[in-house]
UniProtKB/Swiss-Prot annotation:
SUPFAM superfamilies: P-loop containing nucleoside triphosphate hydrolases. GO terms for molecular function: ATP binding; GTP binding. It comes from the Bacteria. ATP binds at G10, L11, S12, G13, A14, G15, R16, N17. The lineage of its organism: Bacteria, Pseudomonadati, Pseudomonadota, Alphaproteobacteria, Acetobacterales. Keywords: ATP-binding, GTP-binding, Nucleotide-binding. This is Nucleotide-binding protein Acry_0446. Displays ATPase and GTPase activities. GTP binds at D54, A55, R56, T57. Belongs to the RapZ-like family.
Amino acid sequence: MSARMVIVTGLSGAGRNSVLRALEDIGYEAVDNPPLRIVETLVRGDKPLAVGVDARTRDFSAEDVLSTIDRLQTRGCVRPELIFITASPEALQRRFSETRRRHPLALAGTVSEGIETEQALTRTLRNAADWVIDTSELSLAGLRQIIDQRFGLGGPGMSITLVSFGYPSGLPQEADLVLDTRFLRNPHYIPDLRDRTGLDPQVRDYIRQDPDFPEFFERVSGLTDYLLPRFVREGKKYVMIAFGCTGGKHRSVSLVEMLGSRLRNADWNVLIEHRSLGSRSVGGAWKAMPGAHQGAPMPGVQK
């Protein structure tokens, strides 16, 4: 067997799309919701493949998904791993409420009815899964860490996640290092900057003018220059550095952006996550963070 393949399924709102994006970021070719009858044709060469299927997939049935996996194994070219993404009904209902989206299986019913219907449709897949990942109390960065640890290809090296957050929301539990930026001048008190964020160059320029900023940023840069190569030497595959401020919008975001730019210029593999803004950046491309739960600890992963 030469190719590696994972099939990602689960409950709507649990984070299946986030898992597919995480797999794509670490080198997989990701295909979402192809008709089941063509899945076997997608396996070619040594390129690792991630296929997303759910109740919206054409011709979907749990039995057909398992039959497809059996046929791929019989061919001998690949042994697909089945990942099932789940979350508690309370977490799913909260996410659908926050995004104001209708559950795809709710039809004229309620979100809770849609969740119950999908749980019944996918129960066989959950029972057959190689991995069950519960995202109820899992942050996006924590989910990405699990995916990288379990399904990483060993190519890109250590992954660095830089996180900005607001202290009222709590510290990121998965962080290896937390830095407090609240001693820096606060753009919140400048009327022209209050409604902007650290993604805005004007906000970053204002923070750079703080007399304490140059030495602080130099010391942070020196610390990362010292630590990161040693983390790599230790065999660490993932590290998270978090910056906090009062609201999680100005100072922490600015520091994450500036350090992220510096590390990317040094060819480090960097993911940026702004928890209070609900966004993330991979290689400089911004994406929304649907359903990301802030400041939550990582749960266990069932195998």
